[in-house]
Amino acid sequence: MSDVKLKPTYWRTCRALANEDRLRLFKAVVENEGRFSVRQYARLLGLQDDVASVYLRQMNARGLLGVKREHIKVFYNLNRDRSLPQAAELQQTLATYMRGNLPAGWEDTLVRIFKGFTHFNRLAIIARLAKGDATLPELERAAGTIVKSTYHHLRFLYAAGVVDTYRVGRGSSLYFLKEPTHPVTKVLLRHVLDEEYSRNSNYNPVVGCLDKASRIVLAKIRREEGVTPTNWKNRRGTGVSRKKLSPKAQRAMLEA
């Protein structure tokens, strides 16, 4: 079972943001920091007072929002919790993103991204894929789950734009970690991998630096060598197959 499960703080932080109403509340705080009361936020977004209060307190508990009390009123702000540096960086990234020109459907995009990080088994899968492409059985072992559960988590990671797959031969597929493009995804991935590295000094992520064609050739090399496709440490390979790799792909293999 992965050590990721021993530190659930981060996936719980993501769970607090995997909700459209909570994201809209966060955006409202960004735009009206320290000026609106809980009741004013509730009216602004068409929420019940107690629902808005619960959502704001949940984000405060995860270090995403600060709070200031004046008599009977409570005002939320973007003051950072220094004891939770990862939450502080995520808060800053999310606030910067929301101050920009948001595209249509931004709430749905962010919910899908955060849902990719809302379970410790998904973080275990991410940590495993950062070390190299993997088969479904390898991801099952990394997450400590059965096939059905692993597929369930992979669906969320795929929807989040974090994971993809490609075929290598008849009836065989490998999963890989995609290069992140969304600023929030970049921060989330870095935090997950930084936590894994802090627990294991031998951990060596090699985040997706190969295109699909190069990945297929690399998998073929591994099959020819009689080792698993994800054994990046073994650098023998066959001359004929290796010539089909681009210079960038060859460097990626040697640096792994």
Model regions and ranges:
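Amphipathic alpha-helical segments enriched in hydrophobic/aromatic and basic residues
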Residues: F26, S37, L64, F75-Y76, ...
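Amphipathic alpha-helical dimerization/coiled-coil segments
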Residues: S2-Y10, K27, E31, R80-K131, ...
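A short, conserved structural fragment
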Residues: N60-K68, Y158-V168
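Residues that mark the N-terminal boundary/hinge immediately upstream of a DNA-recognition element
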Residues: R35-S37, N121, T135-P137
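Short, Lys/Arg-rich nucleic-acid/phosphate-binding segment
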Residues: R69-F75, D81, R167-Y175
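A short acidic, leucine-rich amphipathic alpha-helix
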Residues: Q40-A42, E138-A142
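DNA-contacting interfaces and partner/effector-binding or oligomerization modules
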Residues: S2-G66
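Short amphipathic alpha-helical interaction segments
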Residues: L47-N60, G144-A159
